């Protein structure tokens, strides 16, 4: 029963964030046998001005496999990017979880292979909780496996320091 194979994709940002030393840029392949994937080492990171939008950063070349938390000040945004490839695309529902409920702004953008937006989710502790896709203290985003390849962009802003 495929509906039993829901995957929770966890981004466990210990404290506020965790400094990732692993190489990124690899695709995350999800099969029906996957039950949990820690994405932290598979994300490319970019620190930008707070005013930059998705269209501004999509084609930038400065993405890094890690970031230094003290580079992310109140006037900056931290962007993350990774690619999901579904082994057997179908209508199965998956979930991306950002595991830090203290972040002020967490935005998730899902794009198809032609860079068309499939979904966008604007969440965070400073936003209205009733607009979240799931009533939960963590930031949970649904991801459909109907597309074989999905690029995920994650933007985080926080008025406090990134530790």
Predicted segments with their positions:
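Bacterial N-terminal signal peptides
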Residues: 7-16
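Soluble non-transmembrane domains of integral membrane proteins
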Residues: 22-163
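Positively charged n-region of N-terminal signal peptides that target proteins for export
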Residues: 1-6
């Amino acid at each position: 029963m495929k509906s039993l194979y829901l995957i929770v994709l966890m981004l466990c940002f210990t404290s506020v964030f965790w400094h990732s030393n692993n190489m990124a840029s690899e695709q995350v392949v999800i099969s029906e046998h996957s039950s949990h994937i820690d994405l932290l080492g598979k994300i490319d990171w970019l620190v930008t001005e707070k005013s930059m939008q998705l269209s501004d950063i999509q084609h930038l070349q400065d993405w890094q496999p890690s970031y230094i938390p003290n580079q992310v000040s109140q006037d900056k945004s931290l962007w993350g990017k990774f690619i999901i490839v579904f082994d057997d695309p179908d209508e199965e529902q998956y979930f991306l979880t950002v595991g830090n409920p203290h972040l002020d702004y967490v935005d998730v953008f899902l794009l198809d292979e032609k860079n068309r937006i499939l979904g966008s989710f604007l969440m965070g502790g400073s936003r209205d909780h009733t607009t979240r896709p799931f009533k939960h203290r963590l930031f949970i985003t649904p991801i459909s496996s109907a597309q074989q390849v999905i690029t995920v962009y994650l933007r985080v802003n926080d008025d406090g320091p990134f530790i």
